[in-house]
Amino acid sequence: PNIAVLGADRNGRLINIIRDDGALECSNLKIVRIDGSLYFGSIEKIADYFSKIYDANDIQYVLIAADGINFIDLAAAEWLTNEIRKWQKNRGGIYFAGLKLVSQDVLKKGGFLDKIGNNIFYKDKKTAIAEIHEKFDKPCKMKVFNECVL
């Protein structure tokens, strides 16, 4: 799968930061877009990416822009559950915006939602950002989103 970090452009639109060097990233929330299926063959790449974010120890929250995730198999659901629980225990958390219902069903039917909770899923990025922003325990370093107060 393709993994892209999103930042806000000067119009407030979320955009791949590689495509706009003026795009701003939040100091408390990393927004990551994943395009492609999450399955046993793709988990290593994604796990490595999330390990780097976690090990950097400067981000409390991750929002996965998940409208590009077409499928999640049981191996990926197991990894996601463990990763989400690790972030919930030691940081702020991992959240999803726009995850297709068919992918949520895999998590639900496999019993994974019982472990991670249903409150980490949002229909859209805007709602997710607004609600996650309320959880911040560190002040914003820069005004990236409308919710940010300096």
Predicted features, each with a name:
Residues 1-150:
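Cytosolic C-terminal regulatory domains/tails of membrane transporters and channels
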